């Protein structure tokens, strides 16, 4: 213990004063709204351009809306936010730069690809746990059309995608992290930080295969650091089963691995 928390193993921390997630705001595109998680989103947009002239502006608009929803639901103002940890998939973080411009909150721009939300929550929780902020905003966004332009081919090019190609989410999530003891919807008991694991995947159409080795390594590192055995696990589910699992989360203590799996410990 160092006054802030206990380091556990190679890459994990258990917070001495676990911060809470006070509120969240979520915005999705039309395709995402039609999926199994659609009913959990605060706002499903009928227009993926959000009424803007281009896709990049649309992604910025999603960030503005998600942040606004999180603040409104938490009955908080921009002036009460000490820091913002936010990011997107674009060069120079342009969606975040323009999307956060209207918030007037000190910003740490993050670029962690699909780990950005987990990274934002982790760094935000560390900041609050250490006493450097009372309220911190964590946010991440992506947009199918902007990601296609950035990493593959612009939609106007008309490139043919294989049926097995993964689809970048059009959406944004924002969460307000507050101090231990405050009313919240979840508690961040600790974090496990992942590392780069390159398995040699070179198919730009298969993002899942490229990310899976690092995600698996992080999960296994968490179990090792916290000395969790398979006997302590009550269940595990992929993101396909999240809708059913989510309904059981209330008043229960879970560890959530963003975009990968949900685990529950008997003695967490």
Sequence positions of predicted segments:
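Short, well-ordered amphipathic alpha-helical segments that serve as non-catalytic structural scaffolds
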Residues: 59-75, 123, 210-226
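Short, solvent-exposed loop/edge-beta patches enriched in aromatic
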Residues: 15, 70-80, 132
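Anion-binding (especially nucleotide phosphate/pyrophosphate-binding) glycine-rich loop
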Residues: 78, 84, 88-94, 102-103
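Active-site nucleophile and cofactor-binding loops and adjacent substrate-binding regions
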Residues: 55-59, 85, 106-118, 165-167
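Condensing-enzyme catalytic core mediating Claisen C-C bond formation in acyl metabolism
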Residues: 1-56, 153-221, 225, 261-267
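Short acidic capping loops at alpha-helix termini that bridge into adjacent secondary structure
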Residues: 77-83, 134-135, 229-232
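Disulfide-rich extracellular domains of secreted proteins
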Residues: 215, 228-230, 241
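Claisen-condensing/thiolase-fold acyl-transfer catalytic domains that form or cleave C-C bonds
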Residues: 2-36, 64, 90-91, 99-135, ...
């Amino acid at each position: 213990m160092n006054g802030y928390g206990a380091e556990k193993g190679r890459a994990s921390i258990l917070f001495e004063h676990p911060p809470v997630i006070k509120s969240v705001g979520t915005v999705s595109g039309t395709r995402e709204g039609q999926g199994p998680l659609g009913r959990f989103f605060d706002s499903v947009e009928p227009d993926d351009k959000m009424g803007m002239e281009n896709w990049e502006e649309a992604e910025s608009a999603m960030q503005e809306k998600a942040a606004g929803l999180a603040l409104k639901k938490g009955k908080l103002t921009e002036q009460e936010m000490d820091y913002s940890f936010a990011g997107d998939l674009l060069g120079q973080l342009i969606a975040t730069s323009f999307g956060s411009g209207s918030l007037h909150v000190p910003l740490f721009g993050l670029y962690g690809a699909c780990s950005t939300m987990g990274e934002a929550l982790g760094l935000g929780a560390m900041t609050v746990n250490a006493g450097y902020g009372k309220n911190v905003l964590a946010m991440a966004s992506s947009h199918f059309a902007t990601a296609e332009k950035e990493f593959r081919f612009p939609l106007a090019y008309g490139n043919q995608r294989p049926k097995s190609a993964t689809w970048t989410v059009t959406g944004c999530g924002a969460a307000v992290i507050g101090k231990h003891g405050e009313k919240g919807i979840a508690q961040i008991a600790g974090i496990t930080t992942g590392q780069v694991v390159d398995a040699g995947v070179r198919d730009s159409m298969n993002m899942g295969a490229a990310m899976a080795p690092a995600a698996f390594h992080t999960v296994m590192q968490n179990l090792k650091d916290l000395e969790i055995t398979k006997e302590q696990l009550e269940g595990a589910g992929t993101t396909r089963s999240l809708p059913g699992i989510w309904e059981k989360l209330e008043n229960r203590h879970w560890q959530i691995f963003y975009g990968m799996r949900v685990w529950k410990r008997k003695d967490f």
